[in-house]
Each structure stands twice: as C-alpha cells, then as structure tokens.
A protein has these predicted regions:
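Glycine-rich phosphate-binding loop of ATP-dependent small-molecule kinases
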Residues: 1-272
Length: 272
C-alpha cells in the first residue's frame, strides 16, 4: 500500500501529544492556500481528479473532507456522498451509479465512501452475496485502470482508527446533540463486527492495491494531524504550479445620491 512502513495499519507508533488548535490552524491555513493554487491549476489545465475516502465509522472521513473543501470553490471541489441504492440502481451494473459522478475536465470530485461499499459494509452486513463481493474485488482494479487511462487522477485513502478511539468518538456522538445525526442505525449494528470489518479491509487491500491506483493509509487517532497529513500528501500527488494572479483593486463608487426607501423592512431580532 501507499505507506510500507508497517504491514499493519493499526500498528501505532509512540504516543504523540495532540496538536494544539493554534498550531493546527496555522498549518491548515498554509495548506488551504496551496489547495487554492491547486484548484486554479486544475481548471487551467483541465485536469480530472477523483479522491476516494474510506474507513470505519468514526474514522474521520467527514472532518477530513471538510478541512479540504472549506476554503475552495464547491463548483470545482465536488463532494459525493451517495445514499443507499434504489431498487432501480440495484438492478444496474454495480459501478454505474458511481461512474456518473466522476469528474469532467477542471473538476475535483471527492467520494465520502465509494464503490468500495461492496467490499466493506455490504459484505459485512450481508447486503450482497460472497460471489458478488468476489466479482467486485476482481473487477474494481480493471474499472480503476480504465479511469486512469481516461485521464483521471485517482487517489484512494483509508483512514485507520483504533477500536478504543472509534468507541470514544461514537459515544461522543450519542452525547452531543450536534453530532447525533452522524450516528445511524447501521453504525450501531456494525459496532460489534470489528473483526469482520478488519477481514473485509484486508481482503480489499489485497485485491485492489494496484500499481496504477494504490491505497494510502492514514492513521487517524488524532483528527487534526490526519487532516494535515492527508492534505499534504494529496498535494504531493498532483503536480501543480502557482499561476500568476492579477492584482485586484476595488473601483471608486458613489453612495448617497439615491433617495432612501420607506419600505418597512422586517429585521430579525438581534439576540446576540
């Protein structure tokens, strides 16, 4: 896989002190500037970029994607998070509902979970047969080769979290009214199937970690660090240049000559 330092992505090095907010925000600000440069380069060159994020529930996929996209244009950076397939979609070619979301020239598409649902949740929760899983594992590398040959820059990230940290985060979702929406009935059903998900992950890596689209594993025990590490890594995987920016100045404008309206504006209560 992308990082060969450890054969076991759960294997964690010595404990590192959590990154404080000030250091995190400073580093993230610099990376956001680089993402804006990348954005302009992708449009300028007509590049097609697709980034896949996978990992267990609570691994930090959503927070990482938000950190990537919060300072760029949603017209260029497009996030795809598909719901469960409809009955019609279930009757289609498995990859079909994902293919229509792939990037056109000048776009960066980020999948918050992807076609790899078949290798993970669908396999573990019994939503597909073992034969369908194997067919997917055999076919995914060829589909991805086709994407690359069509000119798509495809990056695949797996966020790895320990069972202890996952449990802490899921309990936090239960206790925090701002996060309870993140906890689905499927998350609860999946909670006791850690080993099954581990086996599914290992089979997925073995079958789909290819020379043309390898898997990159990011340890996500520290949410702040994994966001910075992933953004830094993806910037290193897409060659780009800083395009010249024309200086911008605001023109002079005239205000005050228009007669003020008597319209009774309905202002909202100012409680803060």
């Amino acid at each position: 896989m992308g990082n060969k330092k450890s054969s076991n992505p759960v294997d964690t090095a010595a404990k590192i002190a959590p990154l404080d907010n000030k250091a995190y925000e400073k580093a993230l600000r610099k990376l956001h500037v680089e993402l804006v440069k990348l954005q302009r380069w992708v449009v300028h060159k007509g590049l097609k970029v697709c980034i896949v994020f996978e990992g267990r529930d609570g691994a930090g996929k959503g927070g990482t994607i938000k950190a990537i996209t919060e300072r760029v244009s949603p017209r260029i950076f497009r996030v795809v998070a598909l719901p469960s397939p409809t009955e019609r979609e279930k009757s289609q070619l498995y990859f079909q509902r994902y293919i229509k979301h792939l990037p056109a020239a000048g776009e960066i598409v980020i999948f918050d979970r992807s076609w790899y649902n078949r290798a993970g949740v669908e396999r573990v929760m019994g939503f597909c047969t073992p034969e369908e899983v194997q067919k997917f594992l055999d076919g995914a590398p060829m589909v991805e080769r086709g994407m690359v040959e069509s000119g798509i820059i495809l990056l695949k990230y797996w966020l790895e979290v320990s069972p202890q940290e996952q449990e802490r985060r899921l309990r936090d979702r239960i206790d925090d009214g701002r996060k309870i929406w993140k906890l689905s009935p499927m998350d609860i059903k999946s909670f006791n199937r850690w080993d099954e998900y581990t086996a599914a992950r290992d089979a997925m890596f073995a079958a789909t970690d290819t020379a043309w689209v390898p898997w990159f594993v990011a340890r996500s025990e520290d949410k702040k660090r994994v966001r910075l590490n992933i953004i830094t890594h993806l910037l290193s995987q897409i060659p780009y240049e800083a395009l010249p920016v024309e200086p911008v100045t605001l023109p002079k404008r005239k205000i005050g000559k228009m007669k003020q309206t008597n319209f009774p504006f309905r202002f909202i209560p100012e409680k803060f």
